[in-house]
């Protein structure tokens, strides 16, 4: 047991972790070190220290890692073009390994033998946290209350919190599970558990519903250097500010909503509604630039890498050797991903409105429908003959066999 020992709790101030503090003290008789890792949660962190102490924590860490989150987690994933199941831009998935890393650092600093988290036994986060923690320090014990305690639902948690006098943001009527960081806001649970239910218009936190967005389109310029966004509308911005600026621009135009029934790592399907305004713009712009500067074979292979990269991140394998190897490949592909992309935003839509790069592989002289001096169209005949030779031979052989069969009366 951990009686008298220190336990570091991944603390968010939400429903799950709010009830975990008194539960751990009651069941383990341990000292709770609450660790809130700031990946851009915003206003919800305002009173989090007082709340954690009032709930029974002996000490509270609040670590601002937004810049590290963008530079070392968001940008590598963006450069990889990783998207899970065609829609999910991995906002929660990317944040978990960074949070796990900081929890391990705090545990080492405090001499704690265990780390606790509030992820449920049905979800992906339990895997992401625990695999990441043990990749960094396999000796640390992990406590996952959701897999142990008698509280079987969020309603049970609300009752427990009221019993312990703990203020919580959730109610019986609004019991969405919300994850909020600089990159996205995710919504799960409640009426969203039925895929037939349309998300309510007041669900969204950072995006204007598309039907309520401005009636006039807005243009935005995004400049990249070696796959990394560096300027918005000609203005150089630090990574965190750049994400915040694009969140505002995309959000007011209704851009960045993804409603997805996804395949969880643990084997079941779940529904999530994601708000990723800046990410939606950056992925769109980055891809348009890659279309311009990458050769065909690299693009095709990178598409395969992007899918595998997304699976690794989603499944909690951020610190795996394979991901490190894929990072090396991705980095090589990004050497010429430099240029400017212009996007047109209108009521939830993102439309390419122009792209340019000093490393463009597009040559207008070769593709023009007008008169040109560089391409001899007669050359296409020989190419077509060789390109289709295998099919031509196959057809000839089939015709010969058919003639032979007819000759012998088959």
UniProtKB/Swiss-Prot annotation:
Binding site for ATP: 10-18, 118
SUPFAM superfamilies the UniProt entry points to: Adenine nucleotide alpha hydrolases-like (SSF52402), Argininosuccinate synthetase, C-terminal domain (SSF69864)
Highest taxon in the source lineage: Bacteria
Presence of keyword ATP-binding: yes
Residues the entry annotates as binding L-citrulline: 88, 93, 124, 128, 177, 186, 262, 274
Its EC number(s): 6.3.4.5
Binding site for L-aspartate: 120, 124-125
GO molecular function: argininosuccinate synthase activity; ATP binding
CDD domains in UniProt: ASS (cd01999)
Cited Pfam families: Arginosuc_syn_C, Arginosuc_synth
Primary location group: cytoplasm
Keywords: Amino-acid biosynthesis, Arginine biosynthesis, ATP-binding, Cytoplasm, Ligase, Nucleotide-binding
Subcellular location(s) per record: Cytoplasm
Catalytic activity field: L-citrulline + L-aspartate + ATP = 2-(N(omega)-L-arginino)succinate + AMP + diphosphate + H(+)
Enzyme class label: ligase
Pathway, per record: Amino-acid biosynthesis; L-arginine biosynthesis; L-arginine from L-ornithine and carbamoyl phosphate: step 2/3
NCBIfam families xref list: argG (TIGR00032), PRK00509.1 (NF001770)
Oligomer and partners: Homotetramer.
PANTHER family in the cross-refs: ARGININOSUCCINATE SYNTHASE
Name of protein: Argininosuccinate synthase
């Amino acid at each position: 047991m951990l009686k008298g020992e220190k336990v570091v709790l991944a603390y968010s101030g939400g429903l799950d972790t709010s009830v975990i503090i008194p539960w751990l003290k009651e069941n383990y008789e341990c000292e709770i070190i609450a660790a809130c890792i700031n990946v851009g949660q915003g206003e919800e962190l305002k009173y989090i220290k007082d709340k954690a102490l009032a709930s029974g924590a002996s000490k509270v860490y609040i670590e601002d890692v937004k810049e590290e989150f963008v530079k070392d987690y968001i940008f590598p994933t963006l450069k990889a073009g990783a998207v899970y199941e065609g829609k999910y831009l991995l906002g929660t998935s990317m944040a978990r390994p960074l949070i796990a890393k900081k929890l391990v650092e705090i545990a080492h600093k405090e001499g704690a033998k265990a780390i606790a988290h509030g992820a449920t036994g049905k979800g992906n986060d339990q895997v992401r946290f625990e695999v990441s923690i043990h990749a960094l320090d396999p000796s640390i014990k992990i406590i996952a209350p959701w897999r142990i305690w008698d509280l079987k639902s969020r309603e049970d948690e609300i009752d427990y919190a009221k019993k312990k006098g703990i203020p919580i943001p959730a109610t019986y009527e609004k019991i969405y599970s919300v994850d909020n960081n600089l990159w996205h806001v995710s919504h799960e649970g409640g009426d969203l558990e039925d895929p037939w239910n349309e998300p309510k218009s007041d669900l969204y936190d950072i995006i204007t519903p598309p039907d309520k967005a401005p009636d006039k389109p807005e243009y935005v310029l995004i400049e990249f250097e070696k796959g990394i966004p560096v300027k918005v509308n000609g203005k150089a911005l630090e990574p965190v500010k750049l994400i915040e600026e694009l969140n505002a621009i995309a959000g007011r135009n209704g851009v960045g909503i993804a409603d997805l029934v996804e395949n969880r790592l643990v084997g079941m399907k779940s529904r999530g509604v994601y708000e990723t305004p800046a990410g939606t713009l950056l992925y769109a712009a980055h891809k348009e630039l890659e279309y311009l500067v990458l050769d065909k074979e690299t693009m095709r292979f990178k598409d395969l890498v992007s899918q595998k990269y997304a699976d690794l991140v989603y499944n909690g394998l951020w610190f795996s050797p394979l991901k490190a190897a894929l990072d090396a490949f991705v980095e090589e592909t990004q050497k010429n991903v430099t240029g400017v992309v212009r996007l047109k935003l209108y009521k939830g839509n993102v439309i390419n409105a122009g792209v340019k790069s000093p490393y463009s592989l597009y040559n207008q002289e070769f593709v023009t429908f007008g008169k040109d001096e560089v391409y001899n169209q007669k050359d296409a005949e020989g190419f077509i003959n060789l390109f289709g030779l295998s099919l031509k031979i196959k057809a000839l052989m089939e015709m010969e066999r058919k003639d032979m069969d007819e000759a012998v009366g088959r």
